C-alpha cells in the first residue's frame, strides 16, 4: 500500500528535478548561446556556463553569505570570476607550521601533453628516487591524467612498481582508495583523481609527488572560453588546483607530510606572488 502512495511522489520529485534542470539550461542558453558550440557526447549536451549570473538570485536572497576556501588566493579575481559585486575579505593565519609541510622542488622535465612520450623516463627516475628516500611511508603520486600515470608507471623499475598502486581508467575509484587506506605496507597510489576533496591525515599518507602541474585542458572549449574571458583565469585556476593537491597530506597542526614537485612548470606559478601564499612559499625547501 505504502509503495503505491510513495511511487507517484518519487516520480514527481524526479520530474520536478528534470524541469528545474531544463529551465536552468534554457536560462544559460539565453545568456550564453555559444555554449551550444560544444558538440554532444554520446547524444548528450553538456552546458557549462562561463558566468554565475544564473545563480545570482540565490546570492541576492541572502543578507550575508560566507565563502570559505584555503585557495581563494586573489580575492579581487575570485570576485570578478564569480560575479560577486560587493564583498569583505578576511585572511586567517595558517595553523600548520611550514616545517611540517615542506615542499621539495626537484625538476625532472617540463611536462605537457606534447612531451608525454619523452618525459616518462625522467619522471619515473624522480619517483624511484623519492620512494627510496621514503621507504617506510605511504604516499600519493598525483598524475593529473590517466595517460601520464600509465606512461610513468610503465617506465618504473620492477622494485618500485611493487610499491605503487596504479589507478587506471575504468577502475572503481572508491574501492581502489579504500584498499589503499586499509593496507599497512608502505605503498603509494598513482592517480589523477585524488588532488582535492580527500583526506590523508597522519600515516594515511606521509608524502606525495606531483608529476605535473595541473593546468586545465586547453582541448576543452569551455576552458578556452574562460581563458579568453578572464586574462589570469588559466594560471589562477592552475594554482588553485596545485595548492589543493598540496593540502592532501599534513592535515593537522601535529601532522607531518612532505611534497615533491617534479614538473619544471612549477616555476611559472611561484614567480607570480599573487598565486602563491607566503605560507606556502615559506615551506619551499
Question: Where on the chain are the PLM-derived regions?
Answer:
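Conserved RecA-like P-loop NTPase helicase motor core
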Residues: 107-117, 169-269
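Conserved interdomain hinge at the start of the Helicase C-terminal
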Residues: 56-61, 105-144
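Conserved helicase motor "Helicase C" RecA-like lobe of SF1/SF2 P-loop NTPases
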Residues: 142-169
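Short, low-complexity, polybasic intrinsically disordered segments
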Residues: 8-16, 152, 267-285
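Short secondary-structure boundary/capping segments
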Residues: 39, 79-86, 155-159, 204-207, ...
Amino acid at each position: 500500500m505504502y509503495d503505491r502512495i510513495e511511487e507517484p511522489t518519487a516520480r514527481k520529485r524526479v520530474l520536478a528535478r528534470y524541469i528545474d534542470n531544463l529551465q536552468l539550461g534554457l536560462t544559460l542558453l539565453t545568456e550564453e548561446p555559444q555554449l551550444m558550440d560544444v558538440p554532444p557526447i554520446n547524444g548528450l549536451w553538456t552546458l557549462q556556463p562561463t558566468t554565475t549570473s544564473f545563480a545570482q538570485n540565490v546570492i541576492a536572497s541572502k543578507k550575508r553569505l560566507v565563502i570559505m576556501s584555503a585557495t581563494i588566493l586573489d580575492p579581487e579575481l575570485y570576485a570578478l570570476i564569480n560575479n560577486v559585486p560587493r564583498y569583505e575579505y578576511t585572511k586567517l593565519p595558517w595553523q600548520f607550521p611550514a616545517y611540517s609541510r615542506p615542499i621539495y622542488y626537484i625538476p625532472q622535465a617540463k611536462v605537457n601533453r606534447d612531451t608525454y612520450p619523452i618525459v616518462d623516463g625522467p619522471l619515473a627516475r624522480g619517483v624511484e628516487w623519492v620512494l627510496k628516500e621514503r621507504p617506510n611511508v605511504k604516499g600519493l603520486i598525483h598524475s593529473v591524467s590517466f595517460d601520464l600515470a600509465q606512461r610513468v608507471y610503465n617506465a618504473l623499475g620492477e622494485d618500485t612498481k611493487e610499491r605503487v598502486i596504479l589507478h587506471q581508467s575504468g577502475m572503481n575509484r572508491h574501492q581502489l582508495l579504500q584498499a589503499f587506506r586499509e593496507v599497512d605496507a608502505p605503498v603509494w597510489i598513482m592517480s589523477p583523481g585524488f588532488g582535492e576533496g580527500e583526506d590523508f591525515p597522519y600515516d594515511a599518507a606521509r608524502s606525495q609527488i606531483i608529476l605535473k602541474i595541473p593546468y586545465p585542458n586547453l582541448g576543452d572549449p569551455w576552458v578556452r572560453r574562460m581563458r579568453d574571458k578572464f586574462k589570469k583565469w588559466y594560471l589562477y585556476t592552475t594554482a588553485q588546483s596545485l595548492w589543493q593537491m598540496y593540502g592532501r597530506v599534513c592535515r593537522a597542526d601535529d601532522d607531518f607530510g612532505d611534497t615533491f614537485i617534479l614538473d619544471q612548470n612549477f616555476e611559472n606559478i611561484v614567480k607570480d606572488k599573487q598565486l602563491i601564499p607566503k605560507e606556502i612559499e615559506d615551506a619551499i625547501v
